[in-house]
Each structure stands twice: as C-alpha cells, then as structure tokens.
Amino acid sequence: MDNEQLQKLTEDISLQDFGKPFRHRAFFNDRLKTTGGRYMLSSHNIELNRKYLIEHGRSELVGIIKHELCHYHLHLEGKGYKHRDKDFRDLLQKVGAPRFCTPLQTKKTQKKTYMYRCAACGQQYIKKRAMNPERYACGKCRGKIKRIF
C-alpha cells in the first residue's frame, strides 16, 4: 500500500464511519517506531506507521486510522480530542476504534554495555556509554582502569 491508497482509504473510512470528509493528508511516516499513528494538531495531517500494516495487517491499520480520525474530527469541531476526554472516548466507542494499538512484535535491539575493570584491585564497572579509561581512575583504589568489552 502506498500513500495514495492510504489517502483514499482514510477518506473512505471518514465518510463511512464519521459521515464527514477528511480534507487533509494521510501518509506513512517510516520514522515512527512505537506508535501506530499520530494526528498533527498544526497541519491536521495524519501520520501512520507502516510496520503495523506489515506485521498486523489491514484490519489493524483501519483501527489506527479510525483512532486518528477521532482526534481529527473532534479537534476541528472544538471538542475534547485528547485520550482522557469523554468526547474522545465516546466517539471511539461509537465508531469501534481501539483506544490502544497492538504492540509490535519485532525484536528491540539490546543496548550495548561496556565493562571496565581496575588493574590493581579488580573492581568492575559496567557502563551503558563508552568512556575513555585513560581519563579515569578506580574509585576504590585510584588504580588504572582497563576495558574488558
């Protein structure tokens, strides 16, 4: 599915389920990592995560589009468009849109850890960020620090 097909699908869902036209742009944003989609308040455009279409299929994407269209139509009408607002929750229930999307199953890359050891006393240091061991000394004995991995 490309952006033109997504635009057409969004316009069709808006007319069928909401009875109102969608007059802005809907497109895939490949930079989205964890969210299914987002409604942009300033431009009124809807950005969607292509990974949800690939992993969960068209039905999940339709649910995300409905969710974002709830934000869209309520915001344009001047009603409560935030997740906690009653207007938003009522409209979600009316159109059958999910409140949250199914989490992605793709594996998250494990953060790299760095291990350092004092050459004198053997004190170990595990860090999430790399450091230059020549600039630091052991906090226990002031000995030299060596990088293990």
Swiss-Prot record:
GO terms for molecular function: zinc ion binding. Residues 6-147 form the SprT-like domain. The keyword GTP-binding does not apply. The keyword Hydrolase does not apply. One of its GO terms (biological process) is response to stress. The active site is at E68. Its main location: cytoplasm. Its cofactor is Zn(2+). Zn(2+) binds at H67, H71. Binds 1 zinc ion. Keywords: Cytoplasm, Metal-binding, Zinc. GO terms for cellular component: cytoplasm. Signal peptide: none annotated. InterPro entries: SprT-like_domain (IPR006640), SprT_Zn_ribbon (IPR035240), Uncharacterised_SprT-like (IPR023524). Pfam families: SprT-like, Zn_ribbon_SprT. It is found in: Cytoplasm. Coiled coil: none annotated. NCBIfam families: PRK04351.1. HAMAP family: SprT_like. Belongs to the SprT family. This is Protein SprT-like. It comes from Bacillus velezensis (strain DSM 23117 / BGSC 10A6 / LMG 26770 / FZB42) (Bacillus amyloliquefaciens subsp. plantarum).
